[in-house]
C-alpha cells in the first residue's frame, strides 16, 4: 500500500498541474471524471489525517469557515497608483517628461510595453518558498485588507509556484475580475432569487472579494491576470516583458494581449487597436497601461509622490449618450452646500443604467444655460461618475424654462445663502437634518473617530426618529434602545456601544478632524493638533492671534478664518461643551504632546535638508516606519537615487538602487547606521 504522505503529494502535483492546464492555459489535459476521482481520493486522505493538508492543496480552494472580519496588513512593496493620460497628446507629453527625466534627446527611442488595463480590483499576492502565504487588497497603497482565504478560491492563481527552486519570497500584483459571461450568469441567478442586481462586473468583483464566506467567493468564479513582479535582489528580471514571461512560467495567467514596442509610435498603434477591439473581449478593459520596459531605466526615472514616472494609464474616451432633462433636484452636504442634481431619462453608459448626474453648483448651471426639457449629453467621467457634458440647444423645446436653484433648503426649509465669491449655495441652519446626518457620517468615518458598525442607514434611523440631534447624543445611546432599531440585534447593539466608548480615546487630531470644520482635512487637522494641544488653546489663538494659525505650514488665512468662524459660533461652542460632558477631553494626551514636541525639536535635526532613499527589506523597521523616523528628523524620502541623494538606506535584496548609489558615491547606511544617526 502506498505511503499516504507520498500519495497525497503525488495527488497534489497531478491536480495542480491539471488545474493550471484547464484554468490558465485553457488546454485541459485530464478528463473531468478522472479529476473528480483523484480530488475525492486526496480529500479522503486529508480527512483521515489532517496532518496531510498543505496550503497548496487544491482542496483548500473551496474555502473554509466564514471569517469574522478582515485585518489590515502592510504591503512588502507599496502599490502606487498610475498617472492617467486621456488622449494622444497626454501620452506624448508623458513620453517627453520621461525622456527629460532620463536626460535623453527628444528623438530617443525607448522600449515600451503595452498591456490592457483590466477593469477589476488590484490584489497583492505574497509567496514564501513558492507557496501562497498571503493575499491582500490594494487599500491605500501602503496597507490593505488580508483576504487570503477568498483569493485561494480563484483557480487562475497558483497556490504553489510552478517552478523549481523558487526565490525565498515573491510578490505578485495583478487584477481580479469577473468575465462578462460569468457576470451575466451571476445577475441572472440574483434576479431569480429577487435580489438586487450588481451594477457592473467591477462592483461585483469588489463586493465578492470582501465576502466573509469564502464559499460565496468560490461560487462566483473570479479570474485573475498577473502584471507586476517583485523578487529579491538579482533574481528580478531585467525588464517588464521578462517579468511577464517569468509570471507566465510560474503558473500565473498573464494577459496575452500585450506587446513589446520599440517606440512611442508603436505604442500608439497598440492603443488605437485595442480602443476598437476591446468590445470583442470577454472581459472589461478601460484603457492601456504603458510601461518603460528596462528595469534600470525604471529605477533611474523613479517616482513622484503617488506614481511611477515610468508608467502611465491611457484611459479610453468616456462613452457619451444624449438624453432629455426631466428635472433638477438638490442634495444637501454635511457643510450645508447645496449640490444640484440633474435627473433625466435613463441611458446605458459603461455597463450601467444612468438617470442622475451632479451639476456641481449654480455657476455650472449658468455655464450650460440649462433649461428643463433640454436634450443633454451625459458621460461617465473615468467611466464611474456621471456628468452632464453639454446641452444641444438646437433641440430645445419652445416652452423650455431656465433651471433655477431653490431659494430654500430642500431638507429644512431655511433660506439658502451664497457668501462672497463662493460658487456654492449653502444652508446655514445647524439643526438641518441633512447637515446632521452628514456630520455624523463624517464623525464616525475611518479618518476621524473610526466607529465600526455605525453606517448610513442606522444614522438615518437615529436622526429621523429624533434619537440623535448632535454628535454628543451618540454617546448617550444604550444597547437596549439600539437593539430595538431595524436590522439591529443585541450583539450588534452591544458592539456599537463599546465602539463608541472606545472612540473617546482616539487621538486629538482625529477628534479635531471629526468636527467637520470647513477646509480642515486630515493633514490640516494633524498640523493644527501638533501646534495647539487643545480645543481651548486653538480657540484662544483664533480669537486673539489668528495669524499664528495662518502661519502654520499648509494652513493660510482662509483656513484660519474658517476655523475662527466655526469656533465662535454659539451652536458649535455648545457642541464642544456637550462632547466634554460625555467624556471627550478635546485635547492631546501627554504622550501625544511629547511626540509633537519631539517632532518640533527635530525639525532642525540631524537629517534636516537631507534626501534619503530606502531600498530592500530592513531587518526590524517596515518601510513606513523608517520613512516616519526620517521625516521626523527633518529628512525627505525619495523614490529614486540621483546625484542629489544624501543617503541610501539599504536592507536585504537592495538591488539596482544600491548599485547606482555606489556608482554615484552616495553614502550607504544599514538600518543600524540609520538608528545610530538618529540617536540624540
UniProtKB/Swiss-Prot annotation:
Positions annotated to bind NAD(+): 32-36, 81-82, 115, 138, 175, 291, 315
PROSITE patterns associated with the record: BRCT (PS50172)
Stretch list, region Disordered: 47-66
Active site annotation, chain numbering: 117 (n6-amp-lysine intermediate)
E.C. no: 6.5.1.2
InterPro entries the record matches: BRCT_dom, BRCT_dom_sf, DisA/LigA_HHH, DNA_ligase, DNAligase_adenylation, DNAligase_N, NA-bd_OB-fold, NAD_DNA_ligase_OB
BRCT domain span: 602-680
Residue numbers binding Zn(2+): 409, 412, 427, 432
Keyword NAD: yes
Superkingdom of the organism of origin: Bacteria
Keyword annotations: DNA damage, DNA repair, DNA replication, Ligase, Magnesium, Manganese, Metal-binding, NAD, Zinc
UniProt cofactor(s): Mg(2+); Mn(2+)
Enzyme class at the top of the EC tree: ligase
GO CC terms: cytosol
Reactions performed catalytically: NAD(+) + (deoxyribonucleotide)n-3'-hydroxyl + 5'-phospho-(deoxyribonucleotide)m = (deoxyribonucleotide)n+m + AMP + beta-nicotinamide D-nucleotide
GO MF: DNA ligase (NAD+) activity; metal ion binding
Gene Ontology biological process: DNA repair; DNA replication
HAMAP family with a match to the protein in the record: DNA_ligase_A (MF_01588)
General function of this protein: DNA ligase that catalyzes the formation of phosphodiester linkages between 5'-phosphoryl and 3'-hydroxyl groups in double-stranded DNA using NAD as a coenzyme and as the energy source for the reaction. It is essential for DNA replication and repair of damaged DNA.
Protein family per UniProt: Belongs to the NAD-dependent DNA ligase family. LigA subfamily.
Name of the protein described by the UniProt record: DNA ligase
Amino acid at each position: 500500500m502506498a505511503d499516504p504522505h507520498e500519495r497525497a503529494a503525488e495527488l497534489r502535483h497531478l491536480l495542480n498541474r491539471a488545474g493550471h492546464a484547464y484554468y490558465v492555459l485553457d488546454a485541459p489535459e485530464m478528463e473531468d471524471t478522472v479529476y473528480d476521482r483523484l480530488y475525492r481520493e486526496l480529500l479522503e486522505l486529508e480527512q483521515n489525517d489532517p496532518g496531510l493538508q498543505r496550503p497548496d492543496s487544491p482542496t483548500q480552494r473551496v474555502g473554509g469557515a466564514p471569517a469574522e472580519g478582515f485585518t489590515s496588513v502592510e504591503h512588502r512593496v507599496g502599490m502606487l497608483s498610475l498617472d492617467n493620460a486621456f488622449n494622444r497628446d497626454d501620452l506624448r507629453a508623458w513620453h517627453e517628461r520621461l525622456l527629460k527625466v532620463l536626460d535623453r534627446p527628444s528623438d530617443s527611442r525607448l522600449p515600451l510595453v503595452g498591456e490592457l488595463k483590466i477593469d477589476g480590483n488590484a490584489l497583492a499576492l505574497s509567496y514564501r518558498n513558492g507557496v501562497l502565504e498571503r493575499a491582500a487588497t490594494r487599500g491605500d497603497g501602503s496597507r490593505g485588507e488580508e483576504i487570503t482565504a477568498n483569493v485561494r478560491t480563484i483557480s487562475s492563481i497558483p497556490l504553489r509556484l510552478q517552478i523549481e527552486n523558487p526565490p525565498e519570497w515573491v510578490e505578485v500584483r495583478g487584477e481580479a475580475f469577473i468575465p462578462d459571461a460569468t457576470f451575466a450568469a451571476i445577475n441572472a441567478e440574483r434576479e431569480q432569487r429577487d435580489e438586487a442586481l450588481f451594477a457592473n462586473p467591477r462592483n461585483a468583483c469588489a463586493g465578492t472579494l470582501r465576502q466573509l464566506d469564502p464559499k460565496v467567493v468560490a461560487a462566483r468564479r473570479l479570474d485573475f491576470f498577473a502584471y507586476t513582479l517583485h523578487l529579491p535582489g538579482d533574481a528580478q528580471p531585467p525588464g517588464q516583458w521578462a517579468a511577464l514571461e517569468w509570471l507566465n512560467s510560474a503558473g500565473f495567467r498573464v494577459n496575452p494581449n500585450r506587446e513589446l514596442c520599440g517606440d512611442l509610435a508603436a505604442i500608439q498603434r497598440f492603443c488605437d487597436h485595442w480602443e476598437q477591439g476591446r468590445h470583442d473581449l470577454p472581459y472589461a478593459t478601460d484603457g492601456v497601461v504603458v510601461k518603460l520596459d528596462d528595469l534600470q531605466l525604471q529605477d533611474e526615472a523613479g517616482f513622484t509622490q503617488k506614481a511611477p514616472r515610468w508608467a502611465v494609464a491611457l484611459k479610453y474616451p468616456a462613452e457619451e449618450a444624449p438624453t432629455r432633462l426631466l428635472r433638477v433636484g438638490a442634495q444637501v452636504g454635511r457643510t450645508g452646500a447645496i449640490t444640484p442634481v440633474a435627473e433625466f431619462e435613463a441611458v446605458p453608459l459603461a455597463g450601467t443604467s444612468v438617470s442622475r448626474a451632479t451639476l456641481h453648483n449654480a455657476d455650472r448651471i449658468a455655464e450650460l444655460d440649462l433649461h428643463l426639457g433640454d436634450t443633454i449629453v451625459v458621460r461617465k467621467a473615468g467611466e464611474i461618475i456621471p456628468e452632464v457634458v453639454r446641452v444641444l440647444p438646437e433641440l430645445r423645446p419652445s416652452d423650455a424654462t431656465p433651471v433655477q436653484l431653490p431659494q430654500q433648503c430642500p431638507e429644512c426649509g431655511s433660506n439658502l445663502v451664497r457668501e462672497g465669491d463662493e460658487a456654492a449655495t449653502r444652508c446655514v441652519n445647524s439643526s438641518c437634518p441633512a447637515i446632521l446626518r452628514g456630520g455624523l457620517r463624517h464623525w464616525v468615518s475611518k479618518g476621524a473617530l473610526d466607529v465600526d458598525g455605525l453606517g448610513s442607514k442606522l444614522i438615518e434611523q437615529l436622526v429621523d426618529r429624533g434619537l440623535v440631534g448632535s454628535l454628543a447624543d451618540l454617546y448617550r445611546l444604550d444597547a437596549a434602545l439600539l437593539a430595538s432599531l431595524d436590522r439591529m440585534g443585541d450583539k450588534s447593539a452591544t458592539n456599537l456601544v463599546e465602539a463608541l466608548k472606545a472612540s473617546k480615546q482616539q487621538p486629538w487630531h482625529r477628534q479635531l478632524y471629526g468636527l467637520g470644520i470647513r477646509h480642515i482635512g486630515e493633514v490640516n487637522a494633524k498640523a493644527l493638533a501638533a501646534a495647539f494641544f487643545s480645543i481651548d488653546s486653538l480657540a484662544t489663538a483664533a480669537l486673539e492671534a489668528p495669524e499664528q494659525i495662518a502661519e502654520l505650514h499648509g494652513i493660510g488665512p482662509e483656513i484660519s478664518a474658517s476655523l475662527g468662524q466655526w469656533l465662535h459660533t454659539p451652536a458649535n461652542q455648545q457642541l464642544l461643551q456637550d462632547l466634554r460632558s460625555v467624556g471627550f477631553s478635546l485635547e492631546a494626551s501627554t504622550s501625544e504632546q511629547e511626540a509633537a514636541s519631539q517632532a518640533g525639536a527635530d525639525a532642525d535635526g540631524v537629517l534636516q535638508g537631507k534626501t534619503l532613499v530606502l531600498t530592500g527589506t530592513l531587518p526590524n523597521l517596515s518601510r513606513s516606519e523608517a520613512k516616519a523616523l526620517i521625516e521626523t528628523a527633518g529628512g525627505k524620502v525619495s523614490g529614486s537615487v540621483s546625484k542629489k541623494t544624501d543617503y541610501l538606506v539599504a536592507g536585504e535584496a537592495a538591488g539596482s538602487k544600491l548599485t547606482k548609489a555606489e556608482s554615484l558615491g552616495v553614502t550607504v547606511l544599514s538600518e543600524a547606521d540609520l538608528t545610530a544617526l538618529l540617536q540624540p
